[in-house]
Amino acid sequence: MAAEISISASSRAICLQRNPFPAPKYFATAPPLLFFSPLTCNLDAILRSRRKPRLAACFVLKDDKLYTAQSGKQSDTEAIGDEIEVETNEEKSLAVRLAEKFARKKSERFTYLVAAVMSSLGITSMAVISVYYRFSWQMEGGEMPFSEMFCTFALAFGAAIGMEYWARWAHRALWHASLWHMHESHHRPREGPFELNDIFAIINAVPAIALLSFGFNHKGLIPGLCFGAGLGITVFGMAYMFVHDGLVHKRFPVGPIANVPYFQRVAAAHQLHHSDKFDGVPYGLFLGPKELEEVGVLEELEKEVNRRIKSSKRL
């Protein structure tokens, strides 16, 4: 607490308990009559005429605590105003970034959807036309090659099943090992509609195209088996794209496929693969729930299924 002194002068007489100019004691009684004594006559007048200027001292107390509190409140108000302004600017910039991200994701999904639909329609059309013309060409002799047709479709079904086991082995032994530098892009946030991991789809398409081409241009049981194998690889690739890329990673909408219960379990199992909870298991796709059952973690699978269902309902 600080003290300030204010001093002012006045011409008024001040009364103190003790007169600074006391009168002689003999004034208390009647003064003696002295002739020709001017001091006796004029002493009272002199005392009455003398005036002492009053000195007033005013002490002004300054409360440092109160001053500090008021200054603190003012600074707090200014700080709160600055914080509100900063938060408002941050919210605006965040909203702009979210809008840009949403627009970019929407564009990426549309781009991949167009590519997926065009490739699927093209491959499906080519497969159907190839099957039709191959068997119609072989029937020109008048005999229906039932045995060859049966072997072709049987191997097509077997090739589709076998591709699941091939994908499981390749995923574990190659993609998460020597080819991790390519597959790693699939385990990171994607930037753009495509990723380096998509090259594996092209690599798997090469033998399918070769087998289909050889089986289409040649007659006989062996060419028929090759044609069936290429057809099975093609069907598996299309199913893998819609379930893995569309349903699991939501690179494009898949429609009613998302409501199929078994496909929901497949998607949840593959999501557990990306969580690395069980050393990467499952490495397969369509038989992923079976792999989790083998390691005894079906409870975690059910939790993930329920989580995905709740998340889809919120959307």
UniProtKB/Swiss-Prot annotation:
It is an enzyme of class 1 (oxidoreductase). It is a multi-pass membrane protein. Residues 1-58 form a transit peptide. GO terms for biological process: carotenoid biosynthetic process. It is found in: Plastid, Chloroplast membrane. Its main location: plastid. A motif (Histidine box-2) lies at residues 183-187. A motif (Histidine box-1) lies at residues 171-176. Changing residue 244 to A: Loss of activity. Residues 159-286 form the Fatty acid hydroxylase domain. Keywords: Carotenoid biosynthesis, Chloroplast, Hydrolase, Iron, Membrane, Metal-binding, NAD, Oxidoreductase, Plastid, Transit peptide, Transmembrane, Transmembrane helix. Inhibited by o-phenanthroline and 8-hydroxyquinoline. A motif (Histidine box-3) lies at residues 244-249. GO terms for cellular component: chloroplast membrane. A motif (Histidine box-4) lies at residues 270-274. Changing residue 274 to A: Loss of activity. Its EC number is 1.14.15.24. It catalyses: all-trans-beta-carotene + 4 reduced [2Fe-2S]-[ferredoxin] + 2 O2 + 4 H(+) = all-trans-zeaxanthin + 4 oxidized [2Fe-2S]-[ferredoxin] + 2 H2O; all-trans-beta-carotene + 2 reduced [2Fe-2S]-[ferredoxin] + O2 + 2 H(+) = beta-cryptoxanthin + 2 oxidized [2Fe-2S]-[ferredoxin] + H2O; beta-cryptoxanthin + 2 reduced [2Fe-2S]-[ferredoxin] + O2 + 2 H(+) = all-trans-zeaxanthin + 2 oxidized [2Fe-2S]-[ferredoxin] + H2O. The chain crosses the membrane at residues 112-132, 146-166, 196-216, 222-242. Nonheme diiron monooxygenase involved in the biosynthesis of xanthophylls. Specific for beta-ring hydroxylations of beta-carotene. Produces beta-cryptoxanthin and zeaxanthin. Uses ferredoxin as an electron donor. This is Beta-carotene hydroxylase 1, chloroplastic. It comes from Capsicum annuum.
